[in-house]
Regions:
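Short glycine-centered segments of the SAM/dcSAM-binding site in methyltransferase folds
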Residues: 83, 142, 166, 232-233, ...
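Glycine-rich phosphate-binding loop and adjacent beta-alpha segment
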Residues: 171, 219-290, 324
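Adenosine-nucleotide cofactor-binding segment
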Residues: 161-220, 271-273
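Hydrophobic/small residue at the entry helix of a nucleotide-binding pocket
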Residues: 152
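Glycine-rich beta-strand-centered segment in the early N-terminal region that forms part
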Residues: 22-39, 49-92
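NAD(P)H dinucleotide-binding glycine-rich loop of Rossmann-like/cofactor-binding domains
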Residues: 46, 86-149, 159
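C-terminal hydrophobic helical "lid"/dimerization subdomain
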Residues: 272-324
């Protein structure tokens, strides 16, 4: 028997329990992997708390790294002993071992260790679709990024800088401001004491920005629209402060024929070939050193409840990994 973090009811971190599970053998098209490291993401809190309802009891986590133990029939591109990682897969990463569709697994290059991989897959693939597909960031762009010191934020700001863009980041305090500045943000706004709409206008000389990447949601979204140039894109990819209130679409016309999108990784990575192409770009920018993955906190997997509490309290910065 192996162990996993599961929850039988929604609620706070206290609903997470460490229990024995029977993993079983992989079926057709599946692989069994033994985790070495698991990524922590804010979406895990949404799932645990019931914001995104799941059938219960449920496992948790969509990002991890480890070693293939066994493959099912029809799996030809993986074998036992392969180092793999994933970030676009069914939930269940908070476990010592699990079964997973083999086409969701990505072989890791030798240059990327397991802890780094577990910290970068979901977040890095999210950044890939945001800046390479949702709005294709190009040299000369000035962009606005909320939560710039978070796991996604640190990767996005570095990658966008690598592409030749100027990144304006918002953060909650001076410590996070320093971190964002060190990881690609040319300008940092501490939203607790500055009006980010006014500052964006000042920084851009009134031109505003072509895209806002917003994972905060309720507290920032409407003001984010005021930062966009005509025909600009508001990419809402999270809601750490709560869901955005219903919006009168006429507002988008008034503010300059704006576009609003609520993209998800599962949509962009639905096809195996799309997932592999996205991962190839991610692995290249990390291996080249253009993007550095900063694992700033680690917890034992069995202590996932503590990790959730710290993440919700905004005590963490960068990426957090649960070690198995």
């Amino acid at each position: 028997m192996t162990h996993a973090i599961r929850f039988h009811k929604t609620g706070g971190p206290e609903v997470l329990v460490w229990e024995e599970v029977n993993v079983g053998k992989p079926g057709a098209g599946e692989a069994r992997i033994r985790h070495t490291a698991v990524g922590l993401n804010f979406v895990d809190i949404y799932n645990r708390s019931g914001v995104y309802p799941l059938p219960l009891p449920s496992g948790l986590g969509g990002e991890g790294a480890g070693v293939v133990e066994e493959v099912g029939s029809g799996v030809t591109d993986l074998k036992p002993g392969d180092r793999v990682a994933y970030g676009a897969a069914p939930l269940g990463a908070y476990a010592e071992a699990r079964l997973i569709p083999a086409d969701r697994l990505l072989k890791l290059p030798d240059s990327i260790d397991d802890k780094t991989a577990a910290a970068m897959m979901l977040k890095g693939l999210t950044v890939q679709y945001l800046i390479r597909q949702t709005y294709r960031v190009k040299a000369g762009d000035t962009i606005l990024l909320h939560a710039a010191a978070g796991g996604v934020g640190l990767i996005l700001s570095q990658w966008a800088r690598h592409l030749g863009a100027t990144v304006i980041g918002t953060v909650g305090n001076d410590e996070k401001a320093a971190l964002a500045k060190a990881n690609g943000c040319a300008h940092v706004i501490v939203y607790s004491r500055e009006d980010f709409v006014k500052r964006v206008d000042e920084i851009t000389g009134g031109k505003k920005v072509p895209v806002v990447y917003d994972s905060v949601g309720k507290d920032t979204f409407l003001k984010s629209l005021d930062c966009l140039a005509p025909l600009g894109v508001a990419a809402l990819f999270g809601a750490s402060s709560g869901n955005v209130e219903p919006l009168n679409l006429g507002l988008l016309a008034q503010k300059g024929s704006l576009y609003v999108t609520r993209p998800t990784l599962n949509t962009y990575a639905a096809k195996a070939e799309s997932l592999r192409a996205m991962a190839k770009e991610l692995f290249e920018v990390v291996t080249s050193g253009a993007v550095k993955i900063d694992v700033r906190q680690t917890y034992a997997l069995k202590d996932a409840a503590k990790a959730h509490a710290d993440l919700a309290a905004r005590k963490t910065t960068g990426s957090t990994v649960l070690l198995v």
